Curated annotation (Swiss-Prot):
Pfam families: AAA_2, ClpB_D2-small, zf-C4_ClpX. ATP binds at P110, T111, G112, S113, G114, K115, T116, L117. Zn(2+) binds at C8, C11, C31, C34. ATP-dependent specificity component of the Clp protease. It directs the protease to specific substrates. Can perform chaperone functions in the absence of ClpP. Residues 1-50 form the ClpX-type ZB domain. Component of the ClpX-ClpP complex. Forms a hexameric ring that, in the presence of ATP, binds to fourteen ClpP subunits assembled into a disk-like structure with a central cavity, resembling the structure of eukaryotic proteasomes. One of its GO terms (molecular function) is ATP-dependent protein folding chaperone. It comes from Hydrogenobaculum sp. (strain Y04AAS1). The gene is clpX. The keyword Zinc applies. This is ATP-dependent Clp protease ATP-binding subunit ClpX. Keywords: ATP-binding, Chaperone, Metal-binding, Nucleotide-binding, Zinc. The lineage of its organism: Bacteria, Pseudomonadati, Aquificota, Aquificia, Aquificales.
Length: 399
């Protein structure tokens, strides 16, 4: 306990005039009032720093241009996302008398079409914290699994528990279609009615609430202190394949359209039938109306074609083949994939139904032995991968 003669080294108040005096090294002291002021200054500084970072948000065209560098195809989805993200952060920064709702996003598209990569790249462009959650692991209270608040734990962890930064982060929830409740319209859903409970629990944090977040995760550490996190300005992007949704849309179009088959054929020619999705279709699929209402921006991603996959292998800044070329260049060896090799890799990804996600696994399998041998190779100038996905070694000319 501080003695009566002690004074604060910052404000010079006596220990008699403040609730608490904290003794430091070399006779230095600080009173509890100065500690509170210091904490307020730190919070204000953090707010200003985060606001500065977000204030430099690029315009929609600039966002799409950067997305184009990393993601092949999906032009319409990239436009929709660029506008939604720009409006979301503009809404945070520029206070208005008009109540502008949050532009949470729903991405619908097959496995490997780029949903996760789009969300991750957006967070990178905007320099905001980012977290990914898998909806299939989430359960409502009373069931075995993760609490929905664990989604927020990951976001806090990814920004070193800086609450101000976390408040303006992006959370991507994958496989959101798997928590749809069972319905007669969508018999493919196997999850029981607890899926609706998870939707209700997620609804609160998605629409904006002061959430009590267990910093070490919920159920394994029941006695920890909670962190309060306001989710009002966190952007939520939900994604899923929604297998069976196409049939629901077809049924709706069939009921409302004369010449049903002609109308369906027209949509098939123009593109993805899923692009005709409406909120009622998602409700019939098994999402509750309130949940659908909190995801006002819906974007549909197309299945990637063989040509798209070939471009993904070679064109983006972080293309997997570019990465291997650079690794072999460091060994003084060139690397070339023939057009036939690229096409065979793309065909295999389509056959596996893994889309862009499966390309890396296929290329890594081809390259494993090459990367094992490369550091020991002598006089090899170039390695060419042909349509049989086998390496051909080109040696340096003697002399």
């Amino acid at each position: 306990m501080a003695s009566k003669k002690e004074y604060c080294s910052f404000c010079n108040k006596s220990s008699k005039d403040v609730p608490l005096m904290i003794a430091g090294p070399n006779g230095m002291n600080i009173c509890s009032e100065c500690v509170e002021k210091a904490m307020d200054l730190i919070k204000q500084h953090d707010k200003e720093e985060v606001t500065k970072e977000v204030r430099s948000i690029p315009k929609p065209k600039e966002i799409k241009k950067i997305l184009d560098e990393f993601i092949i195809g999906q032009d319409e989805a990239k436009k929709i996302l660029s506008v939604a993200v720009y409006n979301h952060y503009k809404r945070i920064l520029r206070k208005s008398d008009t109540d502008i709702e949050k532009s949470n996003i729903l991405l619908i598209g097959p496995t490997g079409s780029g949903k996760t990569l789009l969300a991750k790249t957006l967070a990178k462009i905007l320099n905001v914290p980012f977290a990914i959650a898998d909806a299939t692991t989430l359960t409502e209270a009373g069931y075995v699994g993760e609490d929905v608040e664990n989604v927020l734990v990951r976001l806090l962890q990814n920004c070193d528990y800086n609450i101000e930064k976390a408040k303006k982060g992006i959370i991507y929830i994958d496989e959101i279609d798997k928590i749809a409740k069972k319905s007669g319209h969508n018999p493919s859903i196997t999850r029981d009615v607890s899926g609706e409970g998870v939707q209700q629990a997620l609804l609160k944090i998605i629409e904006g609430t002061i959430a009590n977040v267990p910093p070490q995760g919920g159920r394994k550490h029941p006695h920890q202190e909670f962190i309060q996190l306001d989710t009002t300005n966190i952007l939520f992007i939900c994604g899923g394949a929604f297998v069976g949704l196409e049939d629901i849309i077809k049924r709706r179009l069939g009921k409302s359209t004369v010449g049903f088959e002609t109308e369906i054929s027209k949509y098939k020619e123009e593109g993805n039938i899923l692009s005709q999705v409406e909120p009622d279709d998602l409700i019939n699929f098994g999402l509750i109306p309130e949940f659908v209402g909190r995801l006002p921006v819906i974007s549909v991603l197309n299945e990637l074609t063989e040509e798209d996959l070939i471009r993904i292998l070679t064109e983006p800044k972080n293309a997997v083949i570019k990465q291997y070329k650079e690794l072999l260049r460091m060994e003084g060896i060139g690397l070339e994939f023939t057009e036939g090799a690229l096409r065979e890799i793309a065909k295999e990804a389509i056959k596996r139904k893994t889309g862009a996600r499966g390309l890396r696994a296929i290329v890594e399998k081809i390259m494993t032995d090459i990367m094992y041998e490369a550091p020991s190779l002598v006089n090899v100038e170039k390695i060419v991968i042909d349509e049989n996905k086998k390496p051909v070694y080109m040696y340096k000319k003697a002399g």
